[in-house]
């Protein structure tokens, strides 16, 4: 928080920081931060609803309770660098009333993660026709936040929902920062779930492209059918089952009452 304050203090804008406590029971240092004119509010959730839903709840709260022009959702672990907030603000002059995304140009993960990230991008494009190169580190004008909080897929995937509601974006180049402390607690299984949740937002695209793949592939193997050649089709069926199961996370009724999961909002 103090790093954000340092980076934005010379920008001619009024800033507020909203920290989402996602139901954590861990103790933290309750010292007051030196933030000069920046207002800091902590939104504490009663239960942990996951990363995407915590962001969605925060955006809904800000839209309904606060007066603002732009919101910049970002992780608080250091991987979304405060240095790049000024880039977002400067870009609002060029991308008027548009969502601006932070596209990663340099990543700090190992080769294994990088490999699976490339696989994720390929599968996303192959099955949805969408190239998604960003996460939640974005700059959203109020008009986009308004659309975001009435879109049911926002309760499932942040980036997937944003691509669904917006036809075009502005962008800045973003470098992944180093974590402030410790390794990420997100498991490989949760990373896979996160990836497939993005794809599940476009389940109808997935159906159409899967049917086309099935027809073309079956035509190719028609004269050479065996357990080996039909194995990819079994994998496709399993993939479709998972995608449709994850798409059930899109629940506008739960999203509409998400503010009831807020225990308190207090200044820090």
Where are these regions (language model features)?
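Catalytic donor/gating beta->alpha subdomain of glycosyltransferases that bind UDP-sugars
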Residues: 92, 143-205
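Short, acidic, metal-binding catalytic loop of nucleotide-sugar glycosyltransferases
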Residues: 2-14
